[in-house]
């Protein structure tokens, strides 16, 4: 049908993630080696045993793919916090098609108050860390005692809160549709959303079978 889909993968739609992506594309991290991703909030709702995996981690997996490419294999362990009936906290190990290795930790058991999200990507030339979605991004060049720190709001145009990530995501989608971008080239396309879901399906299978599962 040649339709454009703009999936609401809003967590990476902000200037901090775009700057970090620019560093990767410029080669400032060198050959990519690993990625560590974490996200946690308090969500007491109980539904599917895999609610936390399915609802929270399309965002985290999308961020990991944004920086490091497609994921080919997943291993997942999970636990239930006191009083929980669902798998409310999970740990993933991942291998990417390009050889990068990664870890992802997620939880519905920790109340917000301090930063809820962290992404670290490292390569032979250095690493970066994004704190709390868009609040701060730091570049650590390898072999250097110096670091480069960008802190919101001084650099990032006054992003006030999490709601601004939705505005950024919608603005980007409207801009690309207006420019006539092909469906497959949409940033946060339907294909990107499906790719994240395939990773999570493999993670659920891994949790059930206690094996490493290849992403279908």
What are these regions (language model features)?
Residues 22-26, 51-54, 91-93, 121, ...:
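Short, hinge-like loop/turn segments at secondary-structure boundaries
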């Amino acid at each position: 049908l040649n339709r454009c889909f703009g999936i609401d993968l809003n967590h990476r739609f902000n200037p901090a993630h775009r700057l970090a992506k620019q560093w990767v594309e410029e080669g400032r991290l060198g050959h990519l080696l690993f990625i560590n991703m974490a996200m946690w909030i308090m969500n007491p709702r109980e539904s599917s045993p895999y609610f936390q995996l399915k609802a929270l981690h399309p965002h985290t997996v999308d961020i990991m793919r944004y920086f490091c490419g497609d994921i080919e294999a997943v291993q997942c362990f999970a636990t239930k916090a006191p009083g929980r009936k669902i798998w409310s906290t999970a740990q993933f190990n991942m291998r990417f098609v390009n050889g990068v290795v990664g870890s992802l930790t997620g939880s519905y058991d920790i109340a917000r108050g301090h930063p809820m999200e962290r992404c670290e990507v490292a390569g032979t030339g250095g690493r970066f860390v994004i704190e709390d979605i868009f609040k701060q991004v730091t570049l650590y060049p390898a072999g250097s005692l110096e670091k480069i720190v960008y802190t919101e709001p001084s650099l990032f145009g006054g992003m006030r809160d999490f709601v601004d990530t939705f505005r950024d995501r919608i603005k980007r989608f409207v801009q690309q549709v207006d420019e006539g971008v092909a469906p497959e080239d949409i940033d946060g396309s339907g294909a990107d959303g499906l790719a994240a879901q395939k990773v999570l399906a493999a993670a659920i299978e891994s949790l059930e079978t206690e094996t490493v599962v290849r992403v279908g």
